[in-house]
Amino acid sequence: MLIWEQSGLEKVMDELEIMNSNPFYNELFYGKGKVEPKDIMEELLDIKPPRFRYVVKEYGKNAAIIEYLLHNPKDGKPWLGFLMVAKACQNQGLAKKLYTECENELRKMKHPVLRLGILTGNAPAFSFWSRMGFREIEIKENEGKKIHIFEKQF
């Protein structure tokens, strides 16, 4: 059973556990294999509607982090800002299940599209999101990192 718990500063250690189970991503994004509480705290300080972030628990264990933005002020579109599954929970269909729940909610709200960004070098993410029906629409640079913008129309 999946429980979505709204994230915030009180969830730093839960997020840290999930993040540090994925050193590949941390290396790409942060330039180091392990993140520290302050790295996560910086992310969490900016979370306010229409941006939402959750720690997802499965059978009481930290299983994933998911973040979405219902209305990006830059393009007016909803964005999936972050989805990370704890290493121990990967390859079990959890990412697909979480994404599908998000897509279903967006459909109910009559959003016709969803966007997300993938860092250059994140081959597993390219593969996963392509399988979910997303297509690359452009490449941008943010803070010195190339980000591939993907979009899916519903």
State each model region's role.
Residues S130-E138:
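Conserved acetyl-CoA-binding loop of GNAT-fold acetyltransferases
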Residues L2-A88, Y99-E101, E105, K140-E141, ...:
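Acetyl-CoA-dependent GNAT
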